Amino acid sequence: GGGGDRSLGVEYKPVLRPGEAVSVLVAWGDVVLAATGTLTAVSTDGRFLAFAHPFTNRGAVAFPLARSWIHQVVPSLDTPFKIGTPTSIVGIVTQDRPQAIGGFIGRFAPVMDISLNFRDVDSGTETFKRFKTASDPFMMTKVIPEMITGLVDNVWGRVGEGSAKLTLKIEGGRLAEG
């Protein structure tokens, strides 16, 4: 089960307008993690500002930007937020500052493809899961392990204690041997 193509499409010549919903993508596919907000401004050369607040506040970054569909706005005097679904990749977030996120529409961030094959030795079932993620050093060390753990819990489908044997194989170009 799983592993169906839930990847987002890419709009190579998108037209976005201030007020539209956009998301910063961390992961998409069988795992979705994104921050959704409002597009504030777009210049004629494709530069944009959005959110009017930071995402991670880490300065120079490279996250995909997606167009989003808003399901619900949760009002709050302290921290209002939107519940949305990314629908297509439209650009790259290159700056994550205290005042806003910014970047370019029609340019795209590098991403990693993560594929996981789970085999339950008790039942003999196999499950394939796949997602893409921003190629970001922080996300690689902090967020991706949590996503994989969540998939293990989800696929395992059991409640309570237990044991699992995990084998991890990392493949990719220009990886150091060792």
Feature annotation, model-predicted:
Residues 1-178:
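Terminal presequence/propeptide segments associated with secretion/organelle targeting
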